[in-house]
Amino acid sequence: MLLAGRQANALSHPVVLDPVGAGASPFRTETTFNLLEDIAFTVIKGNISEMKTIHSGSGTTKGVDADISDAVTEETLEATVAFAKRLADRNEAVIAITGAIDIVADRDKAYIIRNGHPQMAKVSGTGCMLSAVIAAYCGANPEQLLDATAAAVCLMGVSGELAYERMIRNAAGTSSYRSYLIDEISKMSAKKLEGGAKIENR
């Protein structure tokens, strides 16, 4: 990971960090900080518990999912937006905090995104998919990293909603939902994305 990150930096390619499980074990936390120390990341994407670990150096999560006590709610939204901007400033990177409410921020501006469906949590790998899409969008739009990241997050959320609608129509289950999600990502159009995105800026 270190060699790949260094080479990507040398080539001015976007580098996305998804610190899965940071705060859940000493090894994962130490690895996250080693990467942050050695590599300049374009985007840091994770759940709120992982982001709090990056900020403080330790966390309370017990696995790869966010600790329920950290969940972003309407009551904590403004404070979390301010936190995301501070973290972006400190790390010189776009911050994408994912969850029921997504926040994408740089030091000056934040987007709040309310797309997605709870069914997405029943499929392993959706976070990894999102990291890959963010990297692709940032690679295609290197001068608009914040907007590119927000668009990628919207894409995943809208696709999750459309996949769920298709699952219900077909009386299908979780395995089909995974395939439908990939289908919707691959079939997404600009018109469909713009029409479905539930996004505001702060």
Which positions does each model-derived feature cover?
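Glycine/small-residue-rich loop that forms an oxyanion/phosphate-binding "nest" at active or ligand-binding sites
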Residues: L3-G46
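Short, small-residue-enriched loops and turns at beta-alpha junctions
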Residues: G21-S25, I103, M120
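Conserved phosphate/ATP/ADP-binding segment of small-molecule kinases
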Residues: E30-A110
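Glycine/charged-rich beta-loop-alpha catalytic/anionic-binding loops adjacent to active sites
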Residues: R107-M120
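Short glycine/threonine-rich catalytic loop with a Thr-x-Gly-x-Asp
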Residues: H117-A132, L145-L146
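Conserved post-catalytic alpha-helical subdomain immediately downstream of the catalytic base
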Residues: V133-S176
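Charged C-terminal helix
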Residues: V158-R202
